[in-house]
């Protein structure tokens, strides 16, 4: 067994040498921008066509995104359509529409774009997506769009609807 001595404190020369090598690196990293922030896309118009029916559910048909007034493209994962249905009612959804992903968390169904929505172009969205369930007459649902900078028009559906 050896009697190893604990390492001695570094010498002044070792500390100064290390500092002289690290100073330029620290200066360079301090002068670099911390992040290159891209401006968030704003504008565009989303028309949500569809309807709702007690005992059946909510459906979308012929919905459209118009990027004519958008500041740029909405990249994947930037657009969400969030539908909240009454709690306690079992429901199912159709398969994810082309260009979108569907997730369900409790009574909230979220559709998120998986492909970019280009600026300056019309793009059909949501296909014939539906949420089916035996929702009682008089119960309510909500449909929200994120980001809120997209102008949203509802045709046959309502942002705050009643079955």
Question: Where are the model-predicted features located?
Answer:
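N-terminal secretory signal peptides
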Residues: 1-10, 19, 23, 27-28
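Serine/threonine-enriched low-complexity regions used as flexible
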Residues: 63-66, 134-159
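Short solvent-exposed strand-capping/beta-turn motif centered on an Asx-Ser/Thr pair
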Residues: 69-75, 86-88, 134
């Amino acid at each position: 067994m050896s009697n190893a001595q604990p390492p001695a404190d570094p010498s002044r020369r070792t500390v100064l040498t290390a500092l002289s090598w690290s100073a330029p690196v620290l200066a360079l990293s301090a002068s670099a921008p911390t992040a290159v922030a891209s401006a968030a896309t704003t504008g565009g118009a989303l028309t949500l066509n569809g309807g709702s029916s007690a005992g059946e559910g909510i459906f979308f048909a012929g919905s459209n995104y118009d990027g004519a007034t958008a500041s740029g493209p909405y990249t994947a994962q930037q657009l969400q359509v969030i539908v909240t249905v009454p709690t306690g009612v079992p429901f199912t959804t159709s398969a994810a529409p082309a260009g979108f992903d569907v997730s369900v968390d409790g009574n909230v169904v979220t559709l998120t774009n998986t492909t970019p929505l280009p600026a300056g172009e019309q793009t059909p969205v949501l296909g014939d997506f539906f949420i089916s369930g035996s929702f009682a007459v008089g119960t309510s649902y909500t449909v929200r769009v994120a980001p809120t900078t997209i102008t949203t028009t509802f045709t046959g559906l309502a942002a705050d609807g009643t079955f």
